[in-house]
Amino acid sequence: IAEIQAAIVALRQYQPVVAVIAGSVGCFGGMSIAAALCSYLIMTQEGRLGLNGPQVIEQEAGVQEYDSKDRPFIWSITGGQQRAASGLVDAYVEDDRQQIKQQVLQYLTQGLPDLHRSSNYDFYLNHLQGVDTTEQATPLQVRTLYQGEQA
């Protein structure tokens, strides 16, 4: 996975690298880091994005902390609609091949972003420092965490 991540960083200097997170499998672990390194992220309703998957979090923290079978809760935290509303992805589209293709082509035509998300780490670190980790975050808290000026 590290080689994939290095290739993304090398390629994005020259042209946009677009990640699509669709379907019900989700994008977790090292591949979520690879996705975050891309120039643009596109997600669908069924897509999920997070550093750890629901089952891993449940295994480590317990079902009281994170119930991996509670699908509405999982999507309310890591789903495509939530990630788009949180500003962590660039586009939220229907899980439709033509819509996904159209969005990918739009980003390729648009060119490189002014600032890649992964280069803006100070913004994210500053916001994360204010998070109360003693309580389970609500979907609304997740949505509002990164709102505001990002560059």
Model feature map: region roles:
Residues 1-114:
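Conserved catalytic cores of soluble enzyme domains
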Residues 105-151:
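Intrinsically disordered, low-complexity segments enriched in small/flexible residues
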